[in-house]
Amino acid sequence: MMTWSGNQIPAAFTTVKGRKPSVEIHKRRVSIMSVINELIRTEANGTLSFGNYSLAAKSKVEDFEHEGDLYKVKTFKEITKIERNGMFVYESVPGTAVKDFAVTDTTVTFKVEGFEDAQITVQLEDDCEYEVFEDGVGVGGMKTNMSGKLSLSVELNEGREVEVKIVRK
């Protein structure tokens, strides 16, 4: 991901029809998260990144090893799905790029980007309540169903990532 702020923002991102950018644009932080070209990878901080919503055709990687588990990812513009040891972990419709995906006993965190708003489903603990945050703002409590799936909608725009945090109550 590339991050700029203030006067560091390249001219290509700030000029509007030959005019100087507004102060608001100059002060705004701009983040650009790229898709995961290799479809899945382990980050230096030990988290997973996966998904490429820019692909026209479905692509997949199987048997990707991470911390002793085998992952399978399928991704393209219509869907991104990842499984761990044959079990469901994450799915988005339409497809997304996910960065820094991490799971603990009580929390799931990740950054997500896509072309448009996405319906995201994650596997959690069965029949439990969770608090969901998007970019640090609480969007409400949600309860998983009997199979442990939690679904949420995330407003996405290409070039802007949203930080999602799901915490068990």
PLM regions with names:
Residues 97-100, 107-110, 141-142, 151-155:
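Beta-strand-rich interaction surfaces with strong enrichment in secreted/lumenal proteins
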